[in-house]
Regions:
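Active-site-adjacent structural elements that line small-molecule/cofactor binding pockets in enzymes
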Residues: 1-297
């Protein structure tokens, strides 16, 4: 099983900027990384009561007055700065954008980059952001996401796309160019919840949860149980058991941790490698590593 490694780009916060994006992406490519990733928020309300699923207290640490680059625009920029490395969204919040326009941007990016796009897809968690964007679909965001993913595939793969859904309808329209990747750019579903796993089993080419960030621990034992659930649901959806590839996203902290109190992904390089092998043994073939630091190499 081939193993790939990727890392997140500084597309938000105090490190965000054109030179930083270019520098980290090119350095990652030079070092042999396989993919780079950008995340997605469009407007950050200053008062947020929605529960953030990747913090123990449910409070996100985003700062509304700091830059947060639009991910598809950022990836177009990165495509022009690199030659080989794959370009991913981690994750694109699918309900936020017109689905036909989104499919067009992704298809164009795939063509112009030579087939390097990975669509990491999620439903979103911040109700206040939906409201700020004039969207009333927060409570239906899962159903909207499922429908839009089906529409993307229709547009990307059919010569005469036609789609009649609850949230979007289209017929008798041309849609070109088609993506370079066939049948379409891989769709990796983000999230660790039951609905996310069901979505990956039915619509995804990959599943990409974030782990080791309370309350989403996803240590090897917990992740193994969720993978078994994913495989079962994939077969029930009429697909091969191994149709959905496995990705694990985590922060890595290099320090001198040792002994029984050492946390996973904390420690010396050989300890980190041993931790990663535990996930590899579960069938994980792609790792997205968040390297911790405050300066750009």
């Amino acid at each position: 099983m081939a193993i790939t490694f990727g890392t997140s780009l500084p597309s938000r916060g105090e490190m965000a900027g054109p030179e930083q994006l270019r520098s980290v992406a090119q350095r990652a490519e030079d070092l042999g990384y396989d993919h780079v990733w950008v995340s997605d928020h469009i407007v950050l309300p200053k008062k947020v009561d929605s529960f953030y699923p990747y913090a123990a207290d449910g409070v996100a640490t985003f700062r509304p007055n700091e830059p947060y680059y639009e991910p598809l625009a950022a990836l177009n920029f990165i495509a022009g700065c690199t030659q080989r490395i794959r370009l991913g969204t981690h994750v694109l919040i699918i309900p936020y954008r017109n689905p036909v326009l989104t499919a067009k941007i992704l298809s164009t990016l795939d063509v112009l980059s030579g087939g390097r796009v990975i669509l990491g897809a999620g439903v979103g968690w911040m109700e206040e952001e939906f409201q700020a964007m004039g969207l009333d679909t927060y409570k239906e965001r899962g159903a909207v996401t499922d429908e839009y993913l089906q529409l993307y595939k229709e547009l990307w793969t059919k010569e005469n796309p036609s789609f009649q859904g609850k949230y979007y309808q289209i017929s008798d329209s041309g849609f070109e160019p088609k993506p370079v990747q066939k049948p379409h750019p891989p769709i990796w579903i983000g999230g660790h919840t039951g609905p996310a796993i069901r979505r990956a089993a039915k619509y995804g080419d990959g599943w990409m949860p974030i782990g080791l960030r309370p309350p989403a621990i996803l240590d090897p034992e917990e992740l193994g149980g969720k993978i078994a659930r994913l495989r079962k649901l994939t077969v029930e959806a009429g697909r091969p058991e191994d149709a959905v590839s496995l990705t694990f996203s985590t922060g890595v902290f290099f320090d001198d941790s040792s002994g029984s109190s050492r946390e996973m992904m904390h420690g010396r390089p050989e300890q980190i490698a041993a931790d990663l092998r535990q996930y590899q043994d579960l069938g994980v073939s792609n790792f997205i590593i968040g390297l911790q630091g405050s300066t750009v190499p």
